[in-house]
Regions:
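Conserved short loop/turn motifs at secondary-structure junctions
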Residues: 103-104, 146-152, 219-220
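A short, compositionally biased
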Residues: 22-27, 137, 237-238
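Short internal loop-to-helix segment that lines adenine-nucleotide cofactor pockets
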Residues: 52-76, 138, 153-208, 220-226
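S-adenosyl-L-methionine
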Residues: 1-170, 179, 243-253, 257-281
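Feature marks short, surface-exposed loop/turn motifs that line or immediately flank catalytic pockets
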Residues: 46, 107, 134-136, 218-220
């Protein structure tokens, strides 16, 4: 299967967006997908994906095969954006609660609106407009929310618009201290900031070994002052996790595999070496 570059996906999505807006009229509209209500803007990438029922992270829901749907358990969505994963996870794990974290004020406001449209799911979702970091030096702006309008501040490769982040920055370890439930799954989609997020949750991750679903965007890592090799080494040697693809097949030569990810991103499941029996190699 041909894997498109991020820029190619955005160009195709932009053409589709213009086509739909021309024929349907309104950019903003309420829709229902898989019995979940959304308020979307057809001029934005994630929203368009929801409208077309294209789930870029659809294989994340394979986690249902190995993760129990239990009371008093919690799943964490870091980089929740408008709720495209938070809401389906809440529907899929209807006995669990969801912690939904989005750093940009723009996307967070859209997330809250989408939760209001889903009152039953909302009861089990706790949201935070926090920037998750191990570094006290706060990142004030990040490229996020893929708007198809022209904007000179957009990222040169993935075309994300520059958005202001929350004034509140917290480590994952400190945030988790406030949660009185068992956390067995963490989803991380932070556009290159993966190492900082993992470091900020080092104590918790090392002790409790949650399953992690992570988006790897190697072309963005240098923007945050680290190399992809540093991230791989932290995962394999510091927190002692192995890499699996989204069909639960172990990635044996991670460095070689990741080196082939050029100007795009790829998702992985991470699982602690002590828990490898949960996956089939």
């Amino acid at each position: 299967m041909i894997k498109l570059l991020t820029s190619q996906k955005i160009i195709i999505a932009s053409i589709l967006s213009k086509f739909l807006i021309f024929f349907l009229g309104k950019k903003k509209r309420k829709i229902i997908r898989n019995k979940i209500n959304y308020l979307i803007d057809l001029n934005e990438g994630i929203d368009l994906g929801i409208f077309l029922n294209i789930k870029n992270e659809k294989k994340i829901y394979n986690i249902k095969k190995i993760l129990k749907n239990e009371k008093n358990t919690c799943l964490i969505d870091i980089g929740a954006n408008i709720g495209s994963v938070t809401l389906p996870l809440a529907k899929l794990f209807d006995r669990s609660s969801i912690i939904s974290i989005e750093p940009t004020k723009y996307a967070y406001n859209k997330l809250k609106l989408n939760l209001e449209l889903n009152s039953k799911l909302k009861k089990r979702i706790k949201t935070f407009n926090y920037f998750i970091s191990n570094n006290r030096k706060k990142v004030k702006y990040v490229h996020s929310s893929w708007n198809f309008s022209k904007d000179e501040s957009k990222h040169k490769i993935h075309f994300g618009s520059l958005k202001k982040t929350s004034d509140k920055s917290v480590s994952l370890d400190n945030l988790i201290k406030k949660i009185k439930k068992k956390i067995n799954f963490i989803k991380i989609d932070v556009d290159g900031y993966e190492l900082e997020v993992l470091k900020s949750g080092y104590k918790f991750i090392s002790k409790y070994r949650p399953i992690i679903h992570i988006e790897f965007a190697p072309y963005l890592h240098k923007n945050f002052g680290y190399s992809t090799d540093e991230l791989i080494n932290f995962i394999k040697k510091k927190i002692h996790y192995d890499f699996y693809n989204e069909n639960f097949k172990k990635v044996k030569n991670v460095a070689t595999h990741v080196a082939k990810i050029k100007n795009r991103s790829e998702n992985f499941f991470l699982i602690n070496k002590k828990d490898r029996e949960k996956f089939k190699d």
